[in-house]
Regions:
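Conserved strand-to-loop turn within each blade of WD40 beta-propeller repeats
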Residues: 1, 34-37, 133-136, 193-196, ...
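WD40-repeat beta-propellers
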Residues: 1, 40-44, 140-144, 199-203, ...
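Blade-loop segments of beta-propeller domains
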Residues: 4-31
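A structural motif specific to WD40 beta-propellers
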Residues: 5-8, 51-55, 151-152, 210-212, ...
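WD40/WD-repeat beta-propeller blade N-cap
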Residues: 10-17, 58-65, 156-173, 214-221, ...
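Loop/turn segments within WD40 beta-propeller blades
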Residues: 20-28, 69-74, 121-127, 176-187, ...
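Short loop/turn segments immediately following beta-strands, especially the blade-tip
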Residues: 44-50, 146-151, 246-252, 334-342
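Blade-level signature of beta-propeller repeat domains, shared across WD40, Kelch, NHL, RCC1
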Residues: 313-342
Length: 342
């Protein structure tokens, strides 16, 4: 039995909440909330209750429908890499009036006599950032969760050499994922989907030019998810297809692996199981679909919900999947459980 210890407004009731997000990197019992009131707040759940005052409030002045994204690190990201990051900090620093053309790299050496990798001074700590659609809804902004300050802005109106990707009028940023490819030397990357069906892949070291622009969808991109190895992903849109793709950081390419056509359009949410074996989608047709992520073939269609499915996600141990719907239900599923290697 689940008991509710406290209920109160964390954002204005008139505006509502866009998203909630949690991660081990935020700290024990902490989560982020994103409201349509233009704020992102960090909360603490202590002793079974929710603190009345947020630990941190970011006033983004962003009023939109795009959900925030915390950093996804590859499952191969080891503790030794984090220790190295604490000794040899790589930071991006904004110069001037938040002009993205003046975003320059600064390398800071943490004093060796401080020694301990536990020190927060000078740590690269890529997990201390959050990405969201900006005050200008076509832009992506990255914010520092320690200082509540804007770290970078990524514009959408960039020149494109691709014949099938327009260089302007992409519209609003509709979905995004902040991630950390193994090949990026500890620098943040962002994959953003836009209203015109295009996606831009960014490396924050070069905020003026994306790694690559692609257009896999004909309607607004509603969801993107990067896999646990940060080597590929899946996207859903308001059109009638799901796209699985690879991401090659060394060559700067995003290539379609599998395109899945749907009988009914509309995918609100996508998720890839942490072990990289399964992918799930949440559809406008009230259905949750399960796919073999590596091969792209359909495995199951779940017909439990009675209204539009808005979101789907997997637990960190790959054992449980959760789906949410406009029918005001959240369902927990145990499907194709991972094999116990013991």
């Amino acid at each position: 039995m689940v008991s509710i210890s406290s209920i109160f407004w964390i954002h204005s009731a008139a505006h509502g909440i866009i998203a909630l997000a949690s991660s081990a990197s935020l700290g024990t019992n902490k989560f982020l909330s994103q409201g349509r009131d233009g704020t992102v707040k960090l909360w603490d759940i202590g002793d079974g209750g929710l603190s009345r005052i947020p630990h941190l409030t970011i006033k983004t002045n962003s009023y939109h429908f795009c959900k925030l994204s915390l950093v996804k690190k590859p499952i191969t990201w080891s503790k030794s890499k984090e220790e190295n990051a604490s000794r040899d900090c790589l930071r991006m620093e904004l110069k001037g009036n938040s002009d993205t053309e003046n975003l320059e790299l600064r390398r800071e050496e943490t004093p060796s006599n401080h020694g301990s990798s536990e020190s927060s001074e000078g740590k690269a700590c890529p997990e201390e950032y959050v990405a969201l659609s900006g005050e200008q809804p076509s832009e992506v902004e990255i914010w520092d969760l320690k200082s509540a300050k804007k770290f970078a802005q990524l514009p959408s109106n960039i020149p494109s050499s691709s014949s099938n990707v327009c260089d302007k009028n992409r519209g609003m940023c509709m979905a995004l994922q902040l991630f950390l490819p193994s090949e990026s030397q500890g620098f943040l990357n962002v994959l953003a989907g836009y209203e015109d069906g295009s996606m831009l892949w960014w490396d924050v070291r070069n905020p003026g030019t994306p790694v690559t622009p692609v257009k896999f969808h004909s309607e607004p991109v509603l969801s993107v998810c990067i896999d646990g190895f940060c080597k590929g992903g899946i996207s859903g849109a308001a059109d009638d297809k799901i796209v699985m793709y690879s991401l090659e950081h060394s060559t700067g390419t995003c290539m379609v692996k599998r395109e899945i056509n749907l009988e009914r359009p509309g995918i609100s949410g996508t998720s890839i199981r942490p072990d990289g074996k399964l992918a799930a989608t949440a559809g406008w047709d009230h259905r949750v679909r399960i796919y073999n992520y590596r091969k792209g073939n359909a495995l199951a269609i779940l017909k439990y919900h009675h209204a539009t499915c808005n979101a789907v996600t997997y637990s960190s141990d790959s054992k449980i999947m959760a789906s949410a719907s406009e029918d005001a239900t959240v369902a927990l599923w145990e499907l194709y459980p991972p094999q116990n290697r013991n």
